[in-house]
């Protein structure tokens, strides 16, 4: 099937040409696969791209502005013709199968939620990301969409994480869940954590393995880790920073197999789960390698209709 993806060139921490270089690598790697890209950027950036021979392979859509990292959500909403807004508008109209941005997270989540319908019965969106573990990978959500959530919404996150893992599995594999906390004992955490613990145990039974500490996430003990957006974002950025620190300190002494296995940049960016259409948020600091992973990962997720499969799984679970 043909996949149509939109890429927001603007708003990240690096020059838009870094995004373009990653997209060029993706275009070269597709080897004739039916994928169409629409690139959203200001006219001056489009002008710079015309020098690339691959620029003829994409549709270029000019925006009047872009959402910066410093923009408030209100300022972003007011920019009706920003690259982010135009891309989400195209997704809303069904002209795209997915949209990718490394821009302002709060703005992207807010605009996406305003323009793209939520999956029925999903109360709040959550940023879902895959992290490498000793046994493969785990998904963790939320990592930044919603700072404060209640226990009922955390259960909703768990349902989405489970539906996501099931949608990527071709078998009837069972998956385990854990609640990110400051200790493994049931009594640990705030009153909200304790309430969430009881609800997860009641809803998921033996699939819920209880509380997990940050270090346990990488052990592969659980397949889905549930947390609020504040804690999840701190966890994710700490993990990314530690890997970058080790890569910088050890350099060539870090075995290639270890680099490949535990390099977070090879995974797609964060999926705004709960939306009926695919929106992927790449880290604002993403360089070419991470952006390549985000864009190529988006191709695979769009081709597999991951949002539709999550909605179907969610519907079956709720029925």
From Swiss-Prot:
Signal peptide interval: none
Gene Ontology, cellular component aspect: cytoplasm
Compartment list: Cytoplasm
Pathway: Lipid metabolism; phospholipid metabolism
Gene3D superfamilies recorded: Isopropylmalate Dehydrogenase
GO biological process: fatty acid biosynthetic process; phospholipid biosynthetic process
Entry keyword set: Cytoplasm, Lipid biosynthesis, Lipid metabolism, Phospholipid biosynthesis, Phospholipid metabolism, Transferase
Pfam families in alphabetical order: FA_synthesis
UniProt-listed Enzyme Commission number(s): 2.3.1.274
SUPFAM superfamilies, alphabetized: Isocitrate/Isopropylmalate dehydrogenase-like (SSF53659)
TM regions (residue ranges): none
Catalysis performed (reactions): a fatty acyl-[ACP] + phosphate = an acyl phosphate + holo-[ACP]
Chief site of localization: cytoplasm
InterPro entries in the record: FA_synthesis (IPR003664), Phospholipid_synth_PlsX-like (IPR012281)
GO molecular function: phosphate:acyl-[acyl carrier protein] acyltransferase activity
Enzyme class: transferase
Protein task: Catalyzes the reversible formation of acyl-phosphate (acyl-PO(4)) from acyl-[acyl-carrier-protein] (acyl-ACP). This enzyme utilizes acyl-ACP as fatty acyl donor, but not acyl-CoA.
Quaternary context: Homodimer. Probably interacts with PlsY.
Family: Belongs to the PlsX family.
Protein's name in the database: Phosphate acyltransferase
Gene that this polypeptide is encoded by: plsX
